[in-house]
C-alpha cells in the first residue's frame, strides 16, 4: 500500500497551494512532506508553519471559513486570482477531514478579512456589528430601507469628537452587541439620527451621537452622503472602525484610517 504522504501528494499534485485549516502538529507533518506550497490558516501558528494566515474568528460555516482564509492569503500575496488551491478543512470537528478545491477569483478580495483581522476592536465585536448592519440592509425597518452608522472601537476618543443629539438610552446600561435582545434594540434605534458608539469589547456606549471630526482631506467615493463622510472622517481622527448602511442604495460599507475598505451588498453576503 502506498504511503499516506504519497496518496496525499497525488491528491494535491496539480494545485498551486495547499491550505490547512487549524491542523494539529501530527496532521501538519503528514502534509509537510508534499511538494505543494503549504499554508496554515489558524488562530495561532502552533505548528510553526513557514507560511501562516491568522484566522481571528471561528466560522461554523465551512464556506465562510474558506472564503475568509483565501482572502487573508490574497492580502498577504500568498495566492492570486487564477490560482487553484486545495483546502483541507474540518467538517465534523477534530482535525481537518475534507479536501475542497477552490479557484481563486479576484472578487474574493472583498475587504472582509481586513475588517475583521486588522481592526482595533475585538474581531468578534466587529463581526457582530457587521452582521447587524447586513441584516438591517436585507430587511430594513418594517420593510422600509433604513440607514445606520456604527462606530466601533476607541470609544473614548469618539465620544470626545462627538456630541449627543438626544437622550442616550445606553448611558447607565451594561449591554453588549451580539446579545440577541441588544441586537433588536440596535435595529429599533437605527430609525433615529446619529451614530452608535461601541467599545472595543462590544459595550454599547451611546446612541444618537453627532460626529464632529474635520472632513478635510477625507477620501470617500463620489455620491456618498453625510453619514459616510462622518464615518470616514472619525476613523481618520481615531482608531475606530466605521460600519455604514446606506439608506439610498442599501449597501454596507466600512471605513478605517479615513478610507473605505469594504463595500458589499447585504443580499450577496
UniProtKB/Swiss-Prot annotation:
Induction: Is constantly expressed at different growth phases in rich and selective media. It is an enzyme of class 2 (transferase). Residues 109-266 form the DAC domain. It catalyses: 2 ATP = 3',3'-c-di-AMP + 2 diphosphate. Its EC number is 2.7.7.85. Cannot use Mg(2+), Ca(2+), Ni(2+) or Co(2+) instead of Mn(2+) as cofactor. Its cofactor is Mn(2+). Transmembrane segments: none annotated. Gene3D superfamilies: DNA integrity scanning protein, DisA, N-terminal domain. Disruption phenotype: It was not possible to obtain a strain in which the dacZ gene was deleted in standard growth conditions, indicating that dacZ is an essential gene. Pfam families: DAC, DACZ_N. One of its GO terms (molecular function) is manganese ion binding. Keywords: ATP-binding, Manganese, Nucleotide-binding, Nucleotidyltransferase, Transferase. InterPro entries: DAC_DacZ (IPR014499), DacZ_N (IPR045586), Diadenylate_Cyclase_DacZ (IPR053542), DisA (IPR050338), DNA_integrity_DisA_N_sf (IPR036888), DNA_integrity_scan_DisA_N (IPR003390). NCBIfam families: Diadnylcyc_Halo. Belongs to the adenylate cyclase family. DacZ subfamily. Diadenylate cyclase that catalyzes the condensation of 2 ATP molecules into cyclic di-AMP (c-di-AMP). c-di-AMP is a second messenger for intracellular signal transduction involved in the control of important regulatory processes such as osmoregulation. Is essential for H.volcanii. Overexpression of DacZ leads to cell death, suggesting the need for tight regulation of c-di-AMP levels. Cannot use GTP as substrate. This is Diadenylate cyclase. The lineage of its organism: Archaea, Methanobacteriati, Methanobacteriota, Stenosarchaea group, Halobacteria. The gene is dacZ.
Amino acid at each position: 500500500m502506498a504511503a499516506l504522504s504519497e496518496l496525499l501528494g497525488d491528491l494535491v499534485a496539480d494545485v498551486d497551494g495547499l491550505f490547512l485549516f487549524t491542523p494539529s502538529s501530527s496532521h501538519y507533518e503528514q502534509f509537510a512532506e508534499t511538494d505543494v506550497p503549504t499554508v496554515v490558516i489558524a488562530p495561532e501558528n502552533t505548528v510553526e508553519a513557514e507560511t501562516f494566515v491568522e484566522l481571528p474568528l471561528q466560522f461554523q460555516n465551512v464556506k465562510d471559513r474558506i472564503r475568509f482564509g483565501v482572502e487573508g492569503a490574497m492580502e498577504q500575496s500568498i495566492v492570486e486570482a487564477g490560482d487553484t488551491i486545495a483546502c483541507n478543512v474540518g467538517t465534523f470537528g477534530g482535525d481537518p477531514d475534507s479536501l475542497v478545491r477552490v479557484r481563486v477569483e479576484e472578487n474574493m478580495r472583498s475587504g472582509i478579512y481586513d475588517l475583521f483581522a486588522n481592526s482595533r476592536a475585538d474581531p468578534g465585536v466587529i463581526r457582530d456589528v457587521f452582521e447587524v448592519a447586513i441584516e438591517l440592509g436585507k430587511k430594513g425597518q418594517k420593510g422600509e430601507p433604513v440607514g445606520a452608522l456604527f462606530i466601533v472601537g476607541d470609544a473614548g476618543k469618539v465620544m470626545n469628537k462627538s456630541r449627543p443629539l438626544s437622550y442616550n438610552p445606553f448611558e447607565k446600561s451594561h449591554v453588549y452587541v451580539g446579545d440577541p435582545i441588544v441586537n433588536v434594540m440596535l435595529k429599533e434605534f437605527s430609525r433615529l439620527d446619529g451614530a452608535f458608539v461601541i467599545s472595543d469589547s462590544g459595550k454599547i456606549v451611546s446612541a444618537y451621537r453627532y460626529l464632529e471630526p474635520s472632513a478635510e482631506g477625507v477620501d470617500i467615493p463620489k455620491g456618498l452622503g453625510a453619514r459616510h463622510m462622518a464615518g470616514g472622517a472619525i476613523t481618520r481622527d481615531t482608531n475606530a472602525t466605521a460600519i455604514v448602511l446606506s439608506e439610498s442604495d442599501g449597501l454596507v460599507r466600512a471605513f478605517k484610517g479615513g478610507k473605505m475598505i469594504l463595500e458589499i451588498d447585504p443580499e450577496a453576503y
